[in-house]
Amino acid sequence: MKTPIELKILDSRIGSEFPLPAYATLGSAGMDLRAMIDTTMTIAPGETQLIPTGIAIHVADPGLAAVLLPRSGLGHKHGIVLGNLVGLIDSDYQGPLMVSCWNRSDIPFTLEIGDRLAQLVFVPVVQAQFKLVDEFDSSDRGEGGFGHSGTK
């Protein structure tokens, strides 16, 4: 069963020239988001640009959130990743989805109209309530931090 999420089309090219976000395969975890820009755009090395996706969503269910993740091929082949590394969309957000695109390579990257540039994934959310304590119950790890458990 799929959870219904409200989607608003902000760019009329979505649904006509370019498809609505959808799962590519039965096993896909994310839906591709597209660059709904007006003209071809070049992102210079080291530059970050905010790219519209042409849609807005309203998750509504506080037990869910959406995350924006980079597409692996863009990062590996072209050095294009998300400027904020991961985008978190809270269940009560209703504004346009924008993708912060960072060119971490040393060559310019050309983004064409409608290019797929990020993935939208829905994840469960647990809202925690803190319980104040003076001490923690002991654990095997304790305060061991970065690199504490080794590499092998």
Curated annotation (Swiss-Prot):
It comes from Shewanella sp. (strain MR-7). It catalyses: dUTP + H2O = dUMP + diphosphate + H(+). Substrate binds at residues 71-73, 84, 88-90, 98. NCBIfam families: dut, PRK00601.1. The keyword Signal does not apply. Pathway: Pyrimidine metabolism; dUMP biosynthesis; dUMP from dCTP (dUTP route): step 2/2. Belongs to the dUTPase family. Coiled coil: none annotated. It comes from the Bacteria. Its EC number is 3.6.1.23. Keywords: Hydrolase, Magnesium, Metal-binding, Nucleotide metabolism. This enzyme is involved in nucleotide metabolism: it produces dUMP, the immediate precursor of thymidine nucleotides and it decreases the intracellular concentration of dUTP so that uracil cannot be incorporated into DNA. The keyword Aminoacyl-tRNA synthetase does not apply. GO terms for biological process: dUMP biosynthetic process; dUTP catabolic process. InterPro entries: dUTPase, dUTPase-like, dUTPase-like_sf, dUTPase_trimeric. Its cofactor is Mg(2+). GO terms for molecular function: dUTP diphosphatase activity; magnesium ion binding. This is Deoxyuridine 5'-triphosphate nucleotidohydrolase.
